[in-house]
Amino acid sequence: MQRSLFVALAALGVSLLGPQVAQAQAIIDCVPKGNARPICAFSNPEDMVALPGGQAILIGEYGASAQTTGKLLVFELESEEQRTVYRGGQSQSAAEPGWGDPACTTPPDERFNSHGIDLVRRDDGRLQLLVIQHGSREAIELFEVMGSGTDWRVEWRGCVPAPANASLNSVAAISNGDFYTTQSTPLEPPVDFSKSMPREITGHVYAWSQADKSFRKVGGTDGAVPNGIVTSPDGRYIYMTATGEHSVRKVEVATGREVGRATVDTPDNARWTADGRVLIASLARDLTGEDLGACVSIEQGACSIPFKIVVLDPQSMTIVETLYATDGAPMGAGTVGLRVGDELFIGSYHGDRILRVNLQGQ
């Protein structure tokens, strides 16, 4: 979910829609439905990545203001216990050479606000977590992830300040230290989401080079609300969701050539599976500003916007399967699907829960 949309609609809130509308959108009960079981112990678990070993996942909780700042937490799959591993203002570590922009020397303050995240094994063998951050600064924060099994910790190592006037959303890393990031919209002038999802071009993808310490725009990525992104392991191709266009594009980075495109309703975050396919979170197609505003006005429970998690074949650029779909309880507005073994974990940009879906037999 793009930051500018979240903040704009949160500001409109109940004053625009009325408390009855917001309440009607809320799912309060925390009970299983079919093969999906909600775990109601979170605050806006917008994005997540699998940790090595398959015993835990790392979740980024998304805040929208000084009152609801974000954090990073580890969720243990067997015990279902969660542990906060990073909050802004708590790190005393200094920036480390080779981790981001040398001009970024201080860790985030207490206004830290996690958005899109990605995890990569660097060429030097260390695990690097990249976090889009909006609170104390618009930047990609770089953390080292250390541990094993269910015992994990993170340490801040550096950051890369965002390009001027860019509201970033998602990030996709390469092992050599380079990464790609989506600019959903400019910071100024603000894009109007009050009536519907924009259909005009609002952003693109940036590539950041560890060697040059600089950004460049990736050709062929101008789109209506660029959102989720993953990269091929060698960094040759990127797969970008364009929420306002209902599409996922495959673009060759070096040339800006569009290799393929798939139609996906209101696509959000993307995640690789172990067998080399891409999971796309897809919200209902014809969302209005009122729909989304009702969601961010919810103070308890979960949003009920219909969504599905679909499977993209990255070679043919076709949707080959719907892994999960729901309209209402036990959770709506899914923004990321992460497969770990025979289970699917789903997060949301606004609400108190994640979904744990049993995929055995699928």
PLM regions: where:
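Blade/loop signatures of beta-propeller domains
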Residues: A24-K33, E200, K308, D313
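A short helix->beta-strand "capping" segment at the edge of beta-propeller domains
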Residues: Q25-N44, W99-P102, V154, V320-A325
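Beta-rich, blade/repeat-based domains predominating
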Residues: F42-G53, T68-T69, S91-R121, W156, ...
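Beta-propeller domains
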Residues: L58-S93
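Short, conserved, GDST-rich strand-edge loop motifs in beta-rich repeat architectures
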Residues: I59-G70, V131-I132, T181-E200, A281-S304
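Short loop/turn segments that connect beta-strands within beta-propeller blades
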Residues: E76-E80, V145-G149, W208-K213, E252-G256, ...
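Loop/turn-rich, solvent-exposed surfaces of beta-rich toroidal or solenoidal domains
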Residues: V264-L323
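Blade-level signature of beta-propeller repeat domains, shared across WD40, Kelch, NHL, RCC1
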Residues: A333-Q362
